[in-house]
């Protein structure tokens, strides 16, 4: 008979030979899922509390489990806990150490529980905490954008469509566009959190358990409750242990947040380039070149743009991971953690650095205004002026196109064309047209809810400040 330590794995009594070292390395997750240790201990303590309340384990066993978990917490926090590859994952490592510390009570902890519902609970608990942190970071970034918007309400930026100069906008208004995007990202995170915050524990391996578990007690202990304080428990044991849609949904929300950061990054990269020259980014967020001494490279926005592809890739990976799995749990689901962990880390790091970087942006109003003038940004204002004089808008549009052509020929802005020249295109044009053709006049004219007029921008800034606190 081939002798080996059948206690090295929790499931090894059935087997006649040990797992190969290659398979151990291939199937082990402990060196990345150990970050779940706090959630694992919290879930185990709540489970033990319920087992004792239901008289499934004795009070002495409950006390021993609490003592052992407190000791394990101290060891992990002190960096003294020995994580073992042989024990596969965070769950068995902690359980083995608990049994080593307190004996049989540690063996009783797993009563009525499977690793299938245990890991699903741990990931949900961990992700809930991370979503709360991300919500705070999204708030910080929005506040930073509101501050730079407030300082630059009167600064005129050429607004673009198709990357062509379109109409003048307030730089503050432009910044607030991203505040709106990130506020929706925060809303999505809260919606995801509501679905993450449901308890799988008690589903056991896939079919539930014959023990009289009080799942709602565990949910309440772990804070898995709704807005009214009612416990939120997964209602189908098969679904509870097998689906990772909550991880996919979070990664989708994270991908959207990163896409918004990537769009902002693209603009910062363009605006910092010599071709635009609209802004400077503080030196601490840029790098130089090893060969070209004149270079100041926007590495942080470029990396954020690149990391967006990585996070979106994780979303596609998780969707593909789930698409072919039959019910219930399959080992495939071990592959959910690394992309989920990396998505969380990437999003948090990016939000932190962008909130700080926004505060280090220097705006160059003169360069922005020159660019707006070069692009005939007030052409639409002239068309609106003619429409208000009674000309159908399509005719006004054509008339202004001829005026722009004339200005281009003479290499001047529309506001620099003499009145007599403008009247050649339409005799109803009067001297007051120059108020319309100025960048400032164009900006002030958009005094409508959601518009770019400084008065509207200041109102939106006040609204966001009240919302963000």
UniProtKB/Swiss-Prot annotation:
EC identifiers of the protein: 4.3.2.1
Pathway: Amino-acid biosynthesis; L-arginine biosynthesis; L-arginine from L-ornithine and carbamoyl phosphate: step 3/3
Catalytic function, reaction form: 2-(N(omega)-L-arginino)succinate = fumarate + L-arginine
UniProt keyword Metal-binding present: no
Top-level taxon of the source organism: Bacteria
InterPro entries: Arg_succ_lyase_C (IPR029419), Argininosuccinate_lyase (IPR009049), Fumarase/histidase_N (IPR024083), Fumarate_lyase_CS (IPR020557), Fumarate_lyase_fam (IPR000362), Fumarate_lyase_N (IPR022761), L-Aspartase-like (IPR008948)
Keywords tagged on the record: Amino-acid biosynthesis, Arginine biosynthesis, Cytoplasm, Lyase
PROSITE patterns documented for this protein: FUMARATE_LYASES (PS00163)
SUPFAM superfamilies on file: L-aspartase-like
Source organism of the structure: Polaromonas naphthalenivorans (strain CJ2)
Protein name per its UniProtKB record: Argininosuccinate lyase
Gene coding for it: argH
Annotated GO MF terms: argininosuccinate lyase activity
GO biological process, any: L-arginine biosynthetic process
Compartments, as annotated in UniProt: Cytoplasm
An example Gene Ontology CC term for this record: cytosol
Family recorded in the similarity comment: Belongs to the lyase 1 family. Argininosuccinate lyase subfamily.
């Amino acid at each position: 008979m081939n002798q080996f330590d059948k206690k090295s794995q929790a499931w090894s009594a059935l087997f006649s030979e040990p797992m190969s070292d290659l398979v151990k390395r291939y199937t082990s997750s402990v060196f990345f899922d150990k970050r779940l240790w706090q959630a694992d201990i919290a879930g185990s303590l709540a489970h033990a509390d319920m087992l004792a309340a239901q008289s499934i384990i004795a009070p002495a066993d409950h006390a021993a489990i609490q003592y052992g978990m407190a000791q394990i917490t101290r060891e992990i926090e002190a960096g003294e806990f020995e994580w073992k590859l042989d024990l596969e994952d965070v769950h068995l490592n902690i359980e083995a150490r608990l049994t080593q510390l307190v004996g049989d009570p540690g063996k009783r902890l797993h009563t009525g529980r499977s690793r299938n519902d245990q890991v699903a609970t741990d990931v949900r608990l961990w992700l809930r905490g991370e979503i709360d942190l991300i919500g705070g970071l999204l708030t910080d970034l929005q506040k930073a954008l509101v501050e730079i918007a407030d300082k630059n309400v009167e600064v005129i930026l050429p607004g673009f469509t198709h990357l062509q100069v379109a109409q003048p906008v307030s730089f503050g208004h432009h910044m607030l566009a991203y505040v709106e995007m990130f506020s929706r990202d925060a809303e999505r995170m809260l919606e995801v959190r509501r679905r993450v915050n449901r308890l799988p524990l008690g589903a056991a391996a896939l079919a539930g358990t014959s023990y009289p578990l009080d799942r709602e007690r565990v949910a309440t202990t772990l804070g898995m409750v709704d807005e009214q304080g009612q416990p939120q428990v997964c209602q189908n044991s098969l679904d509870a242990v097998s689906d990772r849609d909550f991880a996919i949904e979070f990664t989708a929300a994270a991908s959207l947040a990163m896409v918004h950061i990537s769009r902002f990054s693209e603009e910062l990269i363009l605006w910092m380039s010599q071709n635009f020259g609209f802004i400077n980014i503080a030196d601490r967020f840029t790098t130089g070149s090893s060969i070209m001494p004149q270079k100041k490279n926007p590495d942080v926005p470029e990396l954020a743009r690149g990391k967006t592809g990585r996070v979106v890739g994780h979303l596609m990976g998780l969707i593909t991971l789930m698409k072919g799995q039959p019910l219930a749990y399959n080992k495939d689901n071990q592959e959910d953690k690394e992309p989920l962990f990396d998505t969380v880390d990437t999003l948090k790091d990016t939000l932190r650095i962008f909130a700080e970087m926004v505060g280090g942006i220097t705006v160059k109003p003169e360069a922005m205004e020159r660019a707006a003038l070069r692009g005939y940004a007030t052409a639409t204002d002239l068309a609106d002026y003619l429409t208000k004089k009674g000309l159908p808008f399509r005719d006004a549009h054509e008339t202004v196109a001829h005026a722009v052509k004339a200005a281009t020929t003479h290499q001047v802005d529309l506001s620099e064309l003499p009145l007599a020249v403008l009247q050649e295109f339409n005799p109803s044009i009067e001297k007051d047209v120059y108020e319309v053709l100025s960048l400032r006049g164009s900006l002030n004219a958009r005094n409508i809810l959601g518009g770019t007029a400084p008065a509207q921008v200041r109102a939106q800034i006040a609204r966001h400040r009240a919302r963000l606190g």
